[in-house]
């Protein structure tokens, strides 16, 4: 018996069984298998298949090429035998016309004409015709907005463009129509009704949009514009250079010597005469603008510098008509002389410098020997309603108040200062008007001040004290309500008297102040008013400023106190809280309460031991202990103590759990 034959038959039988049940073979497969080395066979089969694909592609390509009757050996040889026997069909040739044959024989073919008006470059066309295109676009947009008919505007402008290009009227369109008299009247009515009601700013904006005035300021549109004419630029540069700017040095601007303020005409004449003297005279007045030796020189005229400084020292709020109304029958020269007396300090006399003539302030400074003071009537000073505080007036040493903060001295000016030089703060005033006599005649502007009252401001923003003259509070009858705002506002009027005292705000209405306008702006330099507002921001409400019971109750709950029944009791609680608690708002005062509780618990070793061991504390016993240490805690709400215990990780329980 041949065992090899038997083994081969058994293996074939196993293969037959495996082919009958493929799912069983998958179930019997182990979890991990070692793949056989079949990479070489895969590579060989891939190469063979790629060669077969290339051969098939070549056959398809040759088969497609045989459809064309090319007179080439490659095409005929590669054609299949069935198609090689049949001759290819001849293509029909189109006969040339007699005109084309004549042009070909003579050699003069039809050429394309180039017109100079054709667009060679779209970029060049847009650059050259930018302004006309922009005007066309703006006018089309404006008229379409006024009429509301964009299609009609487009048809009209397109027809006009065709007529301008060809010189003959273009073809008429069926849907084309011009404006009727009724439509033109409608546009005219829109213009008459809209433009008178528009502010000048909107009218100017429309004008600039239509005529292209605003595009020069835009970087993109200005870059698209063609370059301007060189002759125009030369004329503009000459006109600009003809006017020499006024340049002043720091010493000339702040010098103490100056003469009468000359009129602009005389200043220009003197400046012109000095220019005619030649370069030698101008070189004497040259002052370098930089510290390095660059040779740059600036021509400065002393008379112009003095006149400029005089104009700088004039206050914006100086109004001569107000003083003329207060003193009828008194001329301007007499009023100026009477207002500038010897008792007035130097800084105050500086405020009266103007073009109206010689002022007494010039007597305090040495005049130039060449100056001849002559009273002249200069231009009228413009009336400006811009008010400034005394600290912002020119000529006063009040630019930096040392009572408020310190400051570091700069070293960029040529002065050799060290970088660490610091001017310390002080409690004494640094103003130069200590001997200033305060007049008692206050104008009507300082008698009444209107305050805007806001009902939605927080309690911490209440002004508690006001130090000034005697104040009388008056609440206006009407409400100032804006349609866009939800909060309500009211006007409160204050009348001041000349008696200096601490004001009691008990007569103030039941509102909270949001804005206090200090009447430091004065109508004349003589009517200086020292209106001081002492503001104390505290969450507690002072008893001098009564509020409603609802606001007091909300304030007490925000701090963590028990709200009382009556309003007077709640006011007492707020006063007591302001004495015990420190903080600017309710959150800070509430945190101060928590810190006080923690400090009291840390003083008791037995209570602190229970806290460290997480032993529950009876709430009533904890409250009794805290009240025994500080009686003020009796007014604290129990929920506040529970919140503090929860924040500190202290376990609490009630007495009923025992």
From Swiss-Prot:
<comment type="function">
    <text>Regulatory subunit of the SLX1-SLX4 structure-specific endonuclease that resolves DNA secondary structures generated during DNA repair and recombination. Has endonuclease activity towards branched DNA substrates, introducing single-strand cuts in duplex DNA close to junctions with ss-DNA.</text>
</comment>
<dbReference type="InterPro" id="IPR018574">
    <property type="entry name" value="Structure-sp_endonuc_su_Slx4"/>
</dbReference>
<dbReference type="GO" id="GO:0017108">
    <property type="term" value="F:5'-flap endonuclease activity"/>
</dbReference>
<keyword id="KW-0233">DNA recombination</keyword>
<feature type="region of interest" description="Disordered">
    <location>
        <begin position="17"/>
        <end position="37"/>
    </location>
</feature>
<protein>
    <recommendedName>
        <fullName>Structure-specific endonuclease subunit SLX4</fullName>
    </recommendedName>
</protein>
<comment type="similarity">
    <text>Belongs to the SLX4 family.</text>
</comment>
<keyword id="KW-0234">DNA repair</keyword>
<keyword id="KW-0227">DNA damage</keyword>
<feature type="region of interest" description="Disordered">
    <location>
        <begin position="327"/>
        <end position="383"/>
    </location>
</feature>
<keyword id="KW-0539">Nucleus</keyword>
<dbReference type="GO" id="GO:0006260">
    <property type="term" value="P:DNA replication"/>
</dbReference>
<feature type="compositionally biased region" description="Low complexity">
    <location>
        <begin position="99"/>
        <end position="108"/>
    </location>
</feature>
<dbReference type="Pfam" id="PF09494">
    <property type="entry name" value="Slx4"/>
</dbReference>
<feature type="region of interest" description="Disordered">
    <location>
        <begin position="74"/>
        <end position="123"/>
    </location>
</feature>
<keyword id="KW-0597">Phosphoprotein</keyword>
<dbReference type="GO" id="GO:0006310">
    <property type="term" value="P:DNA recombination"/>
</dbReference>
<comment type="subunit">
    <text>Forms a heterodimer with SLX1.</text>
</comment>
<dbReference type="GO" id="GO:0006281">
    <property type="term" value="P:DNA repair"/>
</dbReference>
<feature type="compositionally biased region" description="Low complexity">
    <location>
        <begin position="75"/>
        <end position="90"/>
    </location>
</feature>
<dbReference type="GO" id="GO:0033557">
    <property type="term" value="C:Slx1-Slx4 complex"/>
</dbReference>
<feature type="compositionally biased region" description="Polar residues">
    <location>
        <begin position="365"/>
        <end position="374"/>
    </location>
</feature>
<dbReference type="InterPro" id="IPR027784">
    <property type="entry name" value="Slx4_ascomycetes"/>
</dbReference>
């Amino acid at each position: 018996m041949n065992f090899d034959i038997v083994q081969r038959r058994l293996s074939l039988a196993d293969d037959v069984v495996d082919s009958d049940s493929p799912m069983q073979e998958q179930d019997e497969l182990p979890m991990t298998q070692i793949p056989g080395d079949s990479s070489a066979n895969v590579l060989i089969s891939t190469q063979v298949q790629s060669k077969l694909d290339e051969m098939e592609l070549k056959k398809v390509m040759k088969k497609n090429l045989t459809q064309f009757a090319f007179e080439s050996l490659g095409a005929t040889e590669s054609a299949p035998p069935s198609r090689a026997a049949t001759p290819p069909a001849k293509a029909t040739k189109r006969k040339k016309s007699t005109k084309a044959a004549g042009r070909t024989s003579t050699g003069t073919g039809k050429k394309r004409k180039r017109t100079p008006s054709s667009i060679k470059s779209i970029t060049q066309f847009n650059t050259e015709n930018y302004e006309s295109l922009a005007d066309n676009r703006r006018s089309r947009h404006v008229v379409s907005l006024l009429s509301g008919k964009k299609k009609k505007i487009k048809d009209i402008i397109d027809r006009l463009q065709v007529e301008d290009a060809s010189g003959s009227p273009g073809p008429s369109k069926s849907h084309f129509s011009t404006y009727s008299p009724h439509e033109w009247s409608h546009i005219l009515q829109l213009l008459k009704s809209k433009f008178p009601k528009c502010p000048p700013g909107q009218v100017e904006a429309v004008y600039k949009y239509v005529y292209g005035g605003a595009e020069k300021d835009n970087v993109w549109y200005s870059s698209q514009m063609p370059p301007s004419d060189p002759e125009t630029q030369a004329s503009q540069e000459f006109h600009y250079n003809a006017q020499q700017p006024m340049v002043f040095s720091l010493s000339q601007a702040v010098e103490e010597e100056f003469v009468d303020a000359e009129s602009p005409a005389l200043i220009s004449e003197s400046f012109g005469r000095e220019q005619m003297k030649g370069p030698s005279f101008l070189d004497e007045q040259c002052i370098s603008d930089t510290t390095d030796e660059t040779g740059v020189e600036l021509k400065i005229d002393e008379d112009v510098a003095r006149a400029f400084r005089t104009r700088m020292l004039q206050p914006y709020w100086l109004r001569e008509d107000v003083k003329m109304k207060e003193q009828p029958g008194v001329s301007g020269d007499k009023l100026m002389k009477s207002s500038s007396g010897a008792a007035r300090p130097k800084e105050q006399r500086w405020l009266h410098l103007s073009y109206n003539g010689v002022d007494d302030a010039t007597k305090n400074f040495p005049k130039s020997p060449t100056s001849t003071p002559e009273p002249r009537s200069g231009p009228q000073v413009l009336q400006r309603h811009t008010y400034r505080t005394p600290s912002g007036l020119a000529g006063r040493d009040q630019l930096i108040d040392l009572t408020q903060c310190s400051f570091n001295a700069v070293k960029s000016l040529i002065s050799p200062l060290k970088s660490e030089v610091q001017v310390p703060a002080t409690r004494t005033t640094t103003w130069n008007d200590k001997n200033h006599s305060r007049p008692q005649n206050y104008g009507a502007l300082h008698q009444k001040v209107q305050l805007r009252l806001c009902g939605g401001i927080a309690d911490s923003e209440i002004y508690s004290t006001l130090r000034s003259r005697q104040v009388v509070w008056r609440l206006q009858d009407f409400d100032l309500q804006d349609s866009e705002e939800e909060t309500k506002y009211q006007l409160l009027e204050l009348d001041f008297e000349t008696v200096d005292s601490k004001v009691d705000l008990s007569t103030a209405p039941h509102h909270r102040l949001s804005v206090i306008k200090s009447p430091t702006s004065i109508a004349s330099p003589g009517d200086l008013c020292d209106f001081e507002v002492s503001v104390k921001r505290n969450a507690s409400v002072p008893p001098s400023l009564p509020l409603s019971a609802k606001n007091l109750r909300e304030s007490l709950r925000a701090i963590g106190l028990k709200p009382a029944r009556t309003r007077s009791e709640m006011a007492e609680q707020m006063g007591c809280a302001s004495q015990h608690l420190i903080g600017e708002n309710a959150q800070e005062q509430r945190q101060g309460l928590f810190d006080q509780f923690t400090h009291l618990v840390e003083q008791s070793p037995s209570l602190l031991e229970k806290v460290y061991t997480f032993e529950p504390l009876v709430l009533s016993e904890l409250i009794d202990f805290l009240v025994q240490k500080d009686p003020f805690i009796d007014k604290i709400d129990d929920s506040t103590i529970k919140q503090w215990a929860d924040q500190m990780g202290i376990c609490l329980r009630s007495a009923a759990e025992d």
